[in-house]
Amino acid sequence: MYWKTSPARSSACPRSLLLSARALLFGGLLLVAATSPAVAQDGPAADAGERPEEHSYVAIGVSGTDLGPLNNRLSANGYPTFSTELLSIGGGAYRVVAGRILLGAELNGLLAPSQGFEGRDVFLGGGYGLLSLGYWIEPTPRLRAFPTAGVGAGGLLLNIGDDGSAHFDDVLADPNRSATLSTGSLLVSLGAGLEYQFGTPGGDGLRLGLRGGYLLSALSSDWQLGQSRLGGGPDASMQGPFLRLTVGGVRAALGDATGNKQ
């Protein structure tokens, strides 16, 4: 379920949401970098003289969305529709402080295959950023599990443009040949993950993981064309389940493999 803002406030909502997401993300990264070493000094890792867990990863998977009303409006006007399951590509970083608390940040982009329509190219995509908090569990020295909750913001973008076949005279006859529509929302993520560490436990070796959960959308804005609000737009959001494969430690693993051959 998601909610729309009032018309009086929604004209500036996508931009403010995206600015808030960026500020939240970068502020969180700075907070993690600044505070986690101090917190970790009192944790088990500090007692053992070890550095805290700190890793980055890339992720690819699928993310469900709520595009029903948007697809209905596109279909009613003769345009192609899009699958509600979009390709998700992104990455993130996390740090484990005090031995158990996981602090993370991630960015994900959502993509759908572009569609052709009467000499036009119709594209749907989006993206969002999240700051997350989780609890670190180690069933075995190489296996990690972690429930997480995150907050952030993001937006969807619908672009209708030329497919590359237009001539100069076509543009003169119809200069308004493209349009980019956007909408934004605040997001809450609830999920969990698993990660397996290859090589030395707690080292920098290859790590394979799986993350899944559900993304909730709140305070969705009206659609915008450039800087202008569009009234009467259909509901659309990134709300839905997600599942992603994560890979980390590739550079370290390749470095170890190269060193072993020398």
Task: Locate each region found by the language model.
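Cleavable N-terminal export/targeting peptides
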Residues: 1-52, 253-262
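Predominantly the C-terminal beta-signal and adjacent terminal strand-loop region
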Residues: 195-262
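Outer-envelope beta-barrel architecture signal
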Residues: 50-56, 97-101, 141-147, 184-186, ...
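Residues embedded in well-ordered secondary-structure elements
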Residues: 29, 82, 122, 136-138, ...
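Short glycine/proline- and aromatic-enriched beta-strand/turn motifs that initiate or cap beta-hairpins
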Residues: 37-98, 248-253, 261-262
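Residues on the lipid-exposed face of transmembrane beta-strands in outer-membrane beta-barrel proteins
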Residues: 91-97, 105, 131-135, 149-153, ...
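Mid-length scaffold segments of soluble, non-membrane domains
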Residues: 127, 139-141, 146, 152, ...
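Extracellular/periplasm-exposed beta-strand and loop segments of Gram-negative cell-envelope proteins
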Residues: 65-83, 106-129, 154-187, 217-242
